[in-house]
């Protein structure tokens, strides 16, 4: 494999970290895709949840693509790994799925924070700026949004409450 002419101040550990983050984002996308089509089933039938999780899946895939583009820009090499299967196939109620989604977003956020710490330890200001401007603020917003949804789903309860939340909150947003 040839060495990139574009490479400058790009540590091998940072390059490997970007590849791990690509995998993490693709795993999140894969998990959200599973959630989306669970809520699209005829025996679940919550189209707002389907739409919300499908949008989340697309967003995570876009994050992976952004990281791949960045890897190439810095002269790194993209090394894809196997994407782990989501932890489950059945996602339960909307509340349960949102709780899983919140944990997933917190895991992605922690991975990004670890990557930020790594690139900072190698004095890579460009990568730190990239992570801050493209990912970290968005993660905080996503965690807050999911937390709000969980609070409201607890408030309205399962059954009819969840159905109304699906119609009034999720179908009208994104």
UniProtKB/Swiss-Prot annotation:
Recorded GO CC terms: cytoplasm
Binding site for Fe cation 2: 60, 105, 139
Primary residence: cytoplasm
Domain of life: Eukaryota
CDD domains on file: Euk_Ferritin
Binding of Fe cation 1, residues: 25, 60, 63
Organs and tissues of expression: Expressed in somatic tissues but not in oocytes.
PROSITE patterns: FERRITIN_1, FERRITIN_2, FERRITIN_LIKE
Entry keyword set: Cytoplasm, Iron, Iron storage, Metal-binding, Oxidoreductase
GO biological process: intracellular iron ion homeostasis; iron ion transport
Residue span(s) of domain Ferritin-like diiron: 8-157
Catalytic activity: 4 Fe(2+) + O2 + 4 H(+) = 4 Fe(3+) + 2 H2O
Cellular localisation: Cytoplasm
GO molecular function: ferric iron binding; ferrous iron binding; ferroxidase activity
Cross-referenced PANTHER family: FERRITIN
Family under the similarity heading: Belongs to the ferritin family.
Summary of subunit composition and partner proteins: Oligomer of 12 or 24 subunits. The functional molecule is roughly spherical and contains a central cavity into which the polymeric mineral iron core is deposited.
Function: Stores iron in a soluble, non-toxic, readily available form. Important for iron homeostasis. Has ferroxidase activity. Iron is taken up in the ferrous form and deposited as ferric hydroxides after oxidation.
Descriptive protein name: Soma ferritin
